[in-house]
């Protein structure tokens, strides 16, 4: 039996019970991978009782992932990135103050009963406080990314030692509500039109239903999380030798040059993905037999969709931040650098995932 999370405030659980409509706000702003990792929290709350109205406060850039999500009743987008750009412009500070005030009025008028801060930052703490919820749950100070975040919460949780992965750490914040999560589930709805467009694209590339489509995403949000292009090329050449394998190179903003460098140096022909939005990317990932990527949003999107996924890790810990799921694994660099992660290690892990998929 795993240890129970510690409620640092010392209060007894505010159990989710009673006939009244309970209004809960989840505050998890970014990034894409982190928001995906928090999806099981929404699903656990939705299944905890009837009569819940669930709202998620999220950055505008990640809004598309949550819009129309079956576990949510509403989504409130905020654009703190825009606020940071505006603040340095003439009259920009006044604009930001106006936007913040309107947001505060909007969330305060919802009259939330509970707010759950999964981010642990000052900005997420402020938004949690803006809700005016009498129960405001967050991490204990020693587990917050910014310790002053705990000033804005009144139910503070220290995840148990058994909650190694960030998904399990997020779920531990439900303890003050007396919610015991069941099996972890990710719900990622995709638009049928996006799936049709991507099926048409793959058909144009000659991809057949029996082909083993292997997606490789070479981009990363930070330079120190970026596996060298030469390593990706070596990996792709080896995986292209798998039965019926087709290599699909994915890319995001400012990353197409890396995908082209990999493609142009390969012995086998690879498919360069078209520009995609979030739903189109998801449609491609749902179609693939394996996803290989750095610790980045597309990797975690693939895992959430049930696609076998291999994450490549250097400075971040695979056991905490790796792709979460049955047919998912992370390979850790022995020296903490991405360059120190040899292609052979990634090839062996990828082949093991492909073999497990073939064996069912």
Question: What does each model-identified segment do?
Answer:
Residues 1-360:
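Catalytic machinery of carbohydrate-active enzymes
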């Amino acid at each position: 039996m795993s240890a129970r999370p510690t409620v640092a405030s010392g209060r007894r659980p505010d159990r989710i019970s009673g006939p009244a409509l309970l209004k809960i706000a989840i505050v998890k702003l970014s990034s894409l991978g982190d928001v995906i990792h928090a999806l099981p929290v929404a699903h656990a709350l939705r299944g905890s009782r009837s009569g819940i109205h669930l709202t998620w406060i999220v950055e505008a850039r990640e809004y598309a992932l949550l819009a129309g999500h079956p576990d949510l009743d509403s989504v409130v987008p905020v654009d703190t990135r825009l606020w940071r750009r505006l603040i340095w412009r003439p009259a920009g500070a006044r604009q930001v103050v106006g936007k913040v005030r309107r947001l505060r009025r909007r969330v305060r008028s919802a009259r939330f009963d509970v707010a759950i801060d999964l981010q642990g930052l000052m900005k997420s703490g402020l938004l949690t406080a803006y809700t005016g919820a009498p129960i405001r749950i967050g991490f204990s100070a020693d587990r917050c990314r910014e310790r002053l975040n705990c000033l804005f919460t009144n139910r503070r949780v220290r995840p148990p030692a058994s909650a190694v992965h960030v998904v399990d750490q997020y779920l531990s914040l439900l303890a003050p509500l007396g919610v015991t999560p069941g099996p972890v589930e990710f719900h990622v709805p995709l638009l049928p039109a996006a799936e049709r467009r991507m099926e048409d694209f793959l058909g144009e590339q000659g991809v057949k239903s029996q082909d083993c489509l292997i997606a490789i995403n070479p981009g990363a949000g930070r330079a120190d999380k970026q596996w060298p292009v030469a390593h990706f090329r070596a990996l792709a050449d080896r995986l292209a030798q798998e039965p019926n394998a087709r290599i699909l190179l994915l890319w995001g903003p400012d990353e197409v040059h890396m995908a082209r460098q990999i493609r142009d140096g390969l012995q086998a022909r690879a498919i360069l993905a078209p520009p995609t939005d979030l739903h189109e990317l998801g449609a491609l990932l749902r179609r693939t037999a394996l996803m290989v990527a750095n610790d980045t949003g597309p990797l975690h999107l693939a895992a959430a969709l049930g696609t076998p996924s291999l994450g490549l890790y250097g400075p971040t810990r695979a056991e905490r931040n790796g792709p979460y799921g049955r047919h998912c694994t992370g390979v850790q660099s022995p020296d903490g650098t991405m360059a120190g992660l040899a292609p052979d290690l990634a090839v062996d892990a990828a082949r093991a995932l492909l073999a497990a998929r073939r064996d069912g």
